[in-house]
Every structure is written in C-alpha cells, then in structure tokens.
Amino acid sequence: MSNYFSMEAFDYDDIQLVPNKCIIKSRSEADTGVKFGSRTFKIPVVPANMESVIDEDLAIWLAEHGYYYVMHRFYPEKRADFIKMMHDKGLFASISVGIKDSEYDFIDYLAKENIIPEYTTIDVAHGHSDYVIKMIKYIKEKLPDTFLTAGNIATPEAVRELENAGADATKVGVGPGRACITKLKTGFGTGGWQLAALRMCSKAARKPLIADGGIRHNGDIAKSVRFGASMVMIGSLFAGHEESPGNLITIDGKRYKQYWGSASEVQKGAYRNVEGKQMLVPYRGSIKDTLREMQEDLQSSISYAGGKDLSAIRVVDYVIVKSSIFDGDK
C-alpha cells in the first residue's frame, strides 16, 4: 500500500487557510486568471460536464466571456457539429468522450475531417483503467494538438499512469459530488476526503489537476487551489441558474431547478448500474452573477494569502479544524 495513505484524511469543511500580510490596497487588484492549455481563463472554475449543468447555449456564452467549459458527451452524434459550430463562431471547442469502441471511430472521423477540438476530456467514472490509458494514447496519436484531460481518478499512482500515457491534465474525484452516490453504492470513492485526495495526487502530478466534486462554498475553490488544483469543476453550485438546462420547478412558492448525476437513473434511462441521483437545487438567477461572485471571493482569498495572483494561495499555511468552521454560523 502506498505511504500516501498514512496521511491524515480531511475534506473542505475540515480546513481553514491561514492569512498572510496583505500587499494590495483593494481585492480588485488581485488577478484570478489561470492558464490552462494554450488559453488563459478568468477564473480556475469550470461547470461540470453534466447534462443538467451545461448545454450548447451556455457553452457558447462561457467561451465568449473568457471562461473554460467542457461540453457533456450524452448526445454523441452532435459532437462534430458542435466543434464546427464553435469554430465558425471563432470560439474554442471543448468536448467529452468515453471509451466505448464507437468512440475510436469518432476520433478517426475528427482526424480525417480535420475537425480538431482545442480541448478533449475523457469522462469515465473510474479513470484509472487500462481502457482509459488505451484511449489516451489513441487520442494523442490521432489528435496530437488537442489538450487532453483524463479522469476521474483518486490516487497518485493513477495520476502517474495517465500522465505517462499522454494526458495533459488529470481530473481528481471519485464520487464526492452531491448528485453522486458511488460511495454509497460501491463503498469506494473520495467522498469525505476529496481535498486530501487532491493533496496526495498533487504530490505526484507533473501536469495540471482538475479538482472535480465536493465543492459546497466559494471558499472551497481557494482550498482546491491551495492543495494543487489548476481548475475546479463544480456541479451543484452551477445547476440552479436561469441558463442551466434542468427544468424550473415551483414548490410552495419557491423555485428550483432539476439536477441529476451523470450515472443517475434519469441520465441512463434505466435502473442499471446507477451511481447518481436526481435532486432539486434552489433557483439562483443568472449564472453571470454567480461567476462574478466567485471571482470576487477568489480575489479576496488572494488578498488574504498575501499576494497578487493565484500563486500566493498555493503556499499559504493551513490548519485542520475537523468540521468546526461553521461553529457559530448555524
């Protein structure tokens, strides 16, 4: 067994970052930009590539306004047209693929027709797999110019293997999200220790990591950056917006949006190998306001870290407080 697992396990609510001396007059001076692949984005945040979180219209808006996105893979026949549409608009294309045999034909088609997405994500629940490694090598052979993210994984060994196979970034997180019940159905996952898993993986990583799942508050973004994330993928916090694809539902005068996991019965259309669930999340208005709030909160985090950009957060001290950060707030 790896000695990484002798480390103390902790999650977002167990950690507080320790402030340093502030060197900027206003948080507006703090730069939240992050380089990911060949592009620089406004903040290190990306909506989850789930059908209940992102659709084509939202992908267009995000790309137009300087945010990273990953389009989901649940309408595979539309992906090539999506890439062409984004390129016709002068925008970058970012798609998801799986590992089924038909996906190899799809990659061949993209290569043959020279329809090259700037970003590709291999989206598999258990990404530490021979079949994922095979797909990484195939995509890098056929589409060498695409920036390839692979996942999801939970261990340093998985990071090393996927990076060595050719992945340009790795997605960390097995079942910590609100709509995922992998930990309950299988007994496996990073639920309850997602932040510690990110820390372990960052010690092995030579390339960017995406922290995927378990984000409940904006401050968790800064904590993810502290423990090694270049990007933070978020589902439930983005699912309740006007632009979100889920249906708007009113119950007792309160508005909600539908949100479901990618391995849920809703997504699969059958009760078979279900590791996700459906839920309602409070309606939150426009996603523009949430993204602006996330950026402002992250600017405040940078000011507390004693720096001018995200690099300051990566080196701050932290304390483990064992879920006491909400004491006095309830």
Swiss-Prot record:
Keywords: NADP, Oxidoreductase. Its EC number is 1.7.1.7. GO terms for cellular component: cytosol; GMP reductase complex. The active site is at 180 (thioimidate intermediate). Gene3D superfamilies: Aldolase class I (3.20.20.70). It catalyses: IMP + NH4(+) + NADP(+) = GMP + NADPH + 2 H(+). One of its GO terms (molecular function) is GMP reductase activity. NADP(+) binds at residues 209-232. One of its GO terms (biological process) is purine nucleotide metabolic process. SMART domains: IMPDH. NCBIfam families: GMP_reduct_2, PRK05458.1. PANTHER family: GMP REDUCTASE (PTHR43170:SF5). Catalyzes the irreversible NADPH-dependent deamination of GMP to IMP. It functions in the conversion of nucleobase, nucleoside and nucleotide derivatives of G to A nucleotides, and in maintaining the intracellular balance of A and G nucleotides. Belongs to the IMPDH/GMPR family. GuaC type 2 subfamily. This is GMP reductase.
